[in-house]
From Swiss-Prot:
A motif (Nuclear localization signal 2 (NLS2)) lies at residues 161-224. This is Polymerase acidic protein. Binds 2 manganese ions per subunit. Pfam families: Flu_PA. The lineage of its organism: Viruses, Riboviria, Orthornavirae, Negarnaviricota, Polyploviricotina. InterPro entries: INFV_PA, PA/PA-X, PA/PA-X_sf.
Amino acid sequence: YGEDPKVETNKFAAICTHLEVCFMYSDFHFIDERNESIIVESGDPNALLKHRFEIIEGRDRTMAWTVVNSICNTTGVEKPKFLPDLYDYKENRFIEIGVTRREVHIYYLEKANKIKSEKTHIHIFSFTGEEMATKADYILDEESRARIKTRLFTIRQEMASRGLWDSFRQSERGEETIEERFEINGTMRRLADQSLPPNFSSLENFRAYVDGFEPNGCIEGKLSQMSKEVNARIEPFLKTTPRPLRLPDGPPCSQRSKFLLMDALKLSIEDPSHEGEGIPLYDAIKCMKTFFGWKEPNIVKPHEKGINPNYLLAWKQVLAEIQDIENEEKIPKTKNMKKTGQLKWALGENMAPEKVDFEDCKDVSDLRQYNSDEPESRSLASWIQSEFNKACELTDSSWIELDEIGEDVAPIEHIASMRRNYFTAEVSHCRATEYIMKGVYINTALLNASCAAMDDFQLIPMISKCRTKEGRRKTNLYGFIIKGRSHLRNDTDVVNFVSMEFSLTDPRLEPHKWEKYCVLEIGDMLLRTAIGQVSRPMFLYVRTNGTSKIKMKWGMEMRRCLLQSLQQIESMIEAESSVKEKDMTKEFFESKSETWPIGESPKGVEEGSIGKVCRTLLAKSVFNSLYASPQLEGFSAESRRLLLIVQALGDNLEPGTFDLGGLYEAIEECLINDPWVLLNASWFNSFLTHALR
């Protein structure tokens, strides 16, 4: 199927081994003139002898099916759904040969399940000398089978002595069902014949043509095979060919994450041991009580489009209702806010048009979708690079325990757990890890409340937990969320929420970043600095936002980012190890001198320690989750194609392209207004500059 043997080495080895077993199965077996099976091992066999087995495996598919068809036509044997490996002229049946690195009976069942045919005989060999065959009929004599088993054992030892066996053994997948021949009849058959490309008379013709398509031939040849209409001139791709991506103009882009990142401020309690510890509302009230600088709130940066007094009233309402809770005998576990005018407005209550069943309105003559405006273009702003840099930094707390990146299911090999521990040590204090835990907490709490209290405006504290340098537990409060009505039937149905988050960042410094927020000043905080205590205004960033079941589900699984970046690091270690022919995990993490490429900036290729690489990869993965969007999906997929072409140029592979303009268009239509996509595009331009030097 056009796999590259240099890349898919295990698959290549499996294909070769299987082919060799098929050949050995057939070797020396003949049928004499009395139609008896005989074994002839010496030189030139008698001309009257006929080979007992027809070898089907190893031919190209068109030829193989031709052989199968002709056997079926001459013998009347039922035509198999999948290409078998051999045909036995003595027993008049097809044979499926299996060679497995797993248990023979498991593999046998998979094979039997796949081919679902009583007629085809199955014979499985393993590398450990076990075998299994249909109805325990092993067809061949002991000696022939022993030859095959010995050969397999030799291959295994040869592989093991070169350190290749473990990888080969583990790489075996279950049966793949590529070969199935669906018999298409009736209407479907007529439709299939009608929908063929021009110049094909029947489905069979077309299939034979597709099967004969050489996957690795030259592109021009392929194109000329396709159609007279395609005239793609292959243009050589040279250092001077590519141009930088065009980033959009317009006002600077604004913050669109579901919660504040570098600008967040926490109210914290250490060693929490209060009554009801671990109940979010109790924890939140305890955190609020640690701060004494509250003052009469006022608006310092209004939201352009919103009714700003409502945001102010919403915050005052939160303070008042928290006060009410404290006056009660017993603090409740959850708090539902009164449905005031300001909250109804902020949560879009009764704003959504009523949903009507399509049946009831399909006769409306001018039925149409809402007119929606094109998104407004935005330019790249410097704040998003600062956000990314911050996410790569170390904090003074640890946000995950050692076992946060799940245990392995299999008995864990020493190397894997060693890598995981090294990696965890590098990222446990990283700010991106704080964002993961914050995201998991918020999404879990919001999804929970959305299901448990559908009609209520529930108050949800934004909380995280960590450990200080001294190992003391700490509970942090970032602010609050108030959830709107949440009758979420479909994955994409939206629940609105208002977020209110503490911060020390003055919004007037980068007003464009805070376009979607109304910012209040709500207190003064005393901070210890080198010059003693200073008082700083404390701000509250308020905005309405929304999310859906599917987004919350992904948000709850943000820990996967740890796994993704760990796997990227592992592949770097694997590359090093295969060059040095020994496991390089320890050296990789403990070498203090070596620097690694981290990314591109206008200054050139940035380098850093291995820890910095881990944290940068993690931050990228986390930002892909925090700033997930269709623009990012499109940009990642399309820009990757340009990246591969540029890399091919760097590897002196003389790449050629057609319709490069179309590729640029596909990439640039994703560059609209998303801060993370714009930043990635500007990084991509830096990469282009340096790669084409």
